[in-house]
Amino acid sequence: MMSYDVIVIGAGVVGSAVARELSRYQLKAAVLEKELDVACGNSSRNTGMLHAGFTYKPGSLKAECAVEGNQEFDQVAKELGVPFKRTGKLVVGFTDHDRENILKYKAIGEENGVKGMRMIDKDEINRIDPNAGGEFAMYVPSSGILDPMQYTIGLAENACQNGVKFHFGQKVTGITRDEAKDVWVVKTENDTFETKWVINCAGMYASEISEMLGYPNYPVKGFKGEYYVLDKKAGKFLSIPVYPAPNDKGGFSTHATPTVDGNVLVGPDSYVTEDREDYVVTKEHMDGLFRDGSKMFKQMKREYFIRNFAGIRWKRYNPETGEILDFLLESDDAHPHTVNLVGIESPGVTCALPLARRAVALLVKKEQPQKNENFDPVRLVKKRFHEMSHEEQMAAIKENPLYGEVVCRCETVTKAEILDAIRNPLGVCTVTGIKNRTRATMGRCQGGYCETRITEMIEQEKHLAPEEVRYSKRDSYIFTGKVRDVK
């Protein structure tokens, strides 16, 4: 049986942020994740937006953490080597009702402490970005864009480098209390762990873990949203996220958002689902994204579409009124040595570190652990080959000839970079894991050229048979066997 001072359940963006905060202290900490890598759930299935905090109820945990997370992110991105651009955001409108709602949420944002928001006319929209839709808009300068996969990976790798242990493929099946030893016994499909503290960061499964810890199985509702990914050709025409006016409840419909790597995301829409992992996309919703996205982004063309995907936000709600509730972060003596986080959805990426600090502070207040004097907040990241100058590329190839072998032609990812990703600090290795660390397979051909080459490199580096290589999740085996021998 493996024993720890604290176990975090879930390695999404919040769980990884909690792990990093724990590594600031002299604690034996671990993270249990049911999948084979970090960011395998909705931490990788979102817009990658750094939210400003103008649609959340004043005084709510969402509002406090969104504003706090937004204000600190330049420094966080620098420490972790995470791509980030403070682009600002346009919240555009077409009707008088749109204007009323925008002004309503502008006032809420100001009450929450969001700085610099202002109303602009169509001429100024065109000066900011001529391809943005709208007759008028609210300009929000503090918003930004980031890569949520890279951010989650950065948090987790920094935590790992500072001493936190990550256990992957460990789906939690039960948690019991051993009062005699003053510990929790956490059982997974594969192992048993013993820990004094448990922090629940299980995302869409947080309600089930909550119940295992003795808290309520809080009602949650799934809101699914579908997306288009547009080619980098489209990215040349959009420099700022363009959102429609929020609805009466503060929700947004389809928007157009440039990514830090030059693509454009169009979506999400929103509809209720009961399936926690229903990531299928549908023609009906894709057609709706094209229609609504064209209002936000004037250069919307089907020829730019290279991929689609879906994400699901599991929101805590009141079953009697249907009201969507605030993030829940709780800890009490009736459930000793636990911190319970439930209903963490958008803006979870923006709020991850502020939530983590609050969660870890509850443990620190009780335990008074010594600080980790060797904690290093900086994660060293190599510059991507395609971002290097010609002189830098030649120097890199001279030092390591594998930089001269391009594996992914669309994104110019080299063999040296693929091998670095395979040898990552977390020790994880799937095709999607390589994709999220390098952008290989994310280009126009979506892996048509490089995916089999990456698979072969994984086989060789990890000493796996082809049938053992997985695409992303636990059962996502790519190959089932040989068709024939090639001579």
Tell what function each PLM region has:
Residues 58, 62-67, 92-101, 139-157, ...:
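Short beta-strand to alpha-helix junction loop
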Residues 405-418, 438-456:
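Local cysteine-cluster metal-coordination motifs and their immediate loop/turn environment
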Residues 148, 260-261, 272, 277-406, ...:
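C-terminal catalytic lobe of FAD-dependent flavoproteins
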Residues 17, 175-182, 187-267, 271-280, ...:
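Flavin-dependent oxidoreductases
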Residues 139-197:
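Helical element adjacent to the flavin cofactor pocket in flavoenzyme catalytic cores
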Residues 48-128, 134, 251-254:
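Dinucleotide-binding Rossmann-like beta1-alpha1 core, especially the glycine-rich loop
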Residues 24-44:
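Glycine-rich FAD pyrophosphate-binding loop
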Residues 4-31:
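N-terminal Rossmann-like FAD-binding beta1-loop-alpha1 element of flavoenzymes
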